[in-house]
Amino acid sequence: MIVIPAIDIIDGKCVRLTQGDYSRVQEYNLDPVQQAKYFEKEGARYLHVVDLDGAKKGSPVNFEVIKRIKESTSLSVECGGGIRDKKTINDYLLAGIDYIILGSVIFKNPEFVEDVLKRFGNERFIASLDFEEGYVKLSGWQEATRISVEEGILHIKKLGFQKLIYTDIKTDGMLKGHNFEAAKYIRSLFDGFLISSGGISSMNDVLKLKDIGVDGVIIGKALYTGHVKLNEIINLV
């Protein structure tokens, strides 16, 4: 199992949201590059980066910061947030970003997604499925849909994704534990590389996900608050 620390960026700063609510923002580091270097020093080999401004706007806002993170570390970086056209994908890949995370565009423009997976290779892309109360949410979690989790995953598989990140918005940033029933359900539906996100509050949460058969776990707020020590959890799993 791989452990992936998370950096979310608003206004060029490292922040965390609570339940995806942009009005409940907490700043943790004015310099995301410095934060990435710290995670690397603690033993991280992977990094999850989201341009939250970009997710809301629908186009990149913090590209230069993310580019500097990649240039300043040897971390394998997966990046998402407002990536909805070929130029943006190309810019990120040319900047050395290892994996591109696609979310809303999967449901809003599936023909485009099918095309870029063929053009650039599906191994460079990760699908992101964000849901609340069993239904998919889009556009930085601001837009509700009536697409069920199962329908969303079937759609993602049909497009040809081999990697999937899922987030239960209700648990995200709450430090109250992960939705393990959702983890089991999604694991049963998706046989590719599965990454869990949202609600991790302890080492025990990570070990439970490992037992379920999840391949990777993204940890955000729990690292910033000290609930989980990155080097300890990496050594444990």
Swiss-Prot record:
E.C. code: 5.3.1.16
| Protein localization | Cytoplasm
Q: In which pathway does it act?
A: Amino-acid biosynthesis; L-histidine biosynthesis; L-histidine from 5-phospho-alpha-D-ribose 1-diphosphate: step 4/9
| One of the GO BP terms on file | L-histidine biosynthetic process
The molecular function GO annotations come to:
1-(5-phosphoribosyl)-5-[(5-phosphoribosylamino)methylideneamino]imidazole-4-carboxamide isomerase activity
Name the domain of life: Bacteria
Where mainly found?
A: cytoplasm
- Any keyword GTP-binding? no
Catalytic activity as recorded in UniProt? 1-(5-phospho-beta-D-ribosyl)-5-[(5-phospho-beta-D-ribosylamino)methylideneamino]imidazole-4-carboxamide = 5-[(5-phospho-1-deoxy-D-ribulos-1-ylimino)methylamino]-1-(5-phospho-beta-D-ribosyl)imidazole-4-carboxamide
Query: Where does it sit, as one GO cellular component term?
Result: cytoplasm
Give UniProt keywords alphabetically: Amino-acid biosynthesis, Cytoplasm, Histidine biosynthesis, Isomerase
Q: What class of enzyme is it?
A: isomerase
Does the record's keyword annotation contain DNA-binding?
A: no
Q: Where is the active site?
A: D8 (proton acceptor), D130 (proton donor)
Tell me the InterPro entries matching this sequence: Aldolase_TIM, His_biosynth, HisA_bact_arch, Isoase_HisA-like, Isoase_HisA-like_bact, RibuloseP-bd_barrel
Cross-referenced PANTHER family, in alphabetical order?
1-(5-PHOSPHORIBOSYL)-5-[(5-PHOSPHORIBOSYLAMINO)METHYLIDENEAMINO] IMIDAZOLE-4-CARBOXAMIDE ISOMERASE
Protein family according to the UniProt entry? Belongs to the HisA/HisF family.
The protein depicted here goes by the name 1-(5-phosphoribosyl)-5-[(5-phosphoribosylamino)methylideneamino] imidazole-4-carboxamide isomerase
Encoding gene (name): hisA
